[in-house]
Amino acid sequence: MKLDLFYEIDVPRPWPGEFPENQRRAEQESYAEAFEQIQLADKLGFNTIWLVEHHFREGRSHCSAPEVVHGALSQVTENIRLGFGVCLMPHGFTPPARVAEKVATVDVLSKGRVEWGTGRSTPMEQTAFGVDREQSRAMAEDAIKSVVHMWENEYAEWHSEFLDFPKRLVCPNSTSGTQPQVFESPKQRIVLIERRRYLSAVAPP
């Protein structure tokens, strides 16, 4: 059996003191605790650490830039795989080329230890980033396909209803192969890019 860990970086209130020092201190403590636990998990043989991307989730999820966290983790761990669980994909959050670049950068830094999971986000996040909720599924699927295309082609271009991307060399490139595999829960569709023969996912009902 292979065991994974999932982190949102909870920073529960109350945060004693005055803003902004109280928030900064609480977040620093939560990140430090997470890093300590993940480094121990690496030594104990856990398989993957998954970090979720969320925005504005006060107290519950303060991990808005998992690529930055994974970049740091890549330098203080040796074997544990680094999972984006999930990376928000509808057009409006992050341009697909930037997603391809940041995920591949972590893959290079970690010597091929990246797992890439994707999602559509929550209505609260979509509203703040100007994402059309009704189109979010179609936009996410288009963005995912374009990212994989950028990894699989030396000079990639993409033209669709949502994106016009000219021919460019997107770099760095992922060190791992990409073969899309789709997982669905009753509430949200999750797409994971499989980089190995083994891959599993458990979603809440």
Where are these regions (language model features)?
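N-terminal beta1-alpha1-beta2 module of alpha/beta enzyme domains
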Residues: 1-76, 80-81
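A structural signal for isolated positions on well-ordered beta-strands in alpha/beta enzyme cores
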Residues: 4, 48-50, 83, 115, ...
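Internal, glycine-rich beta/alpha segment that forms the wall or movable "lid"
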Residues: 9, 92-205
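Active-site oxyanion-binding pockets that recognize sulfate/phosphate
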Residues: 23-24, 31, 89, 130-133
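Short, surface-exposed connector motifs at secondary-structure boundaries
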Residues: 50-53, 79-82, 175-178, 197-199
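Short, solvent-exposed loop/turn segments at secondary-structure junctions
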Residues: 55-59, 90-91, 125
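Short His-Asn-centered micro-motif
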Residues: 59, 85, 184-187
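Conserved strand-turn element in the central/C-terminal portion of the radical SAM core barrel
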Residues: 83-91
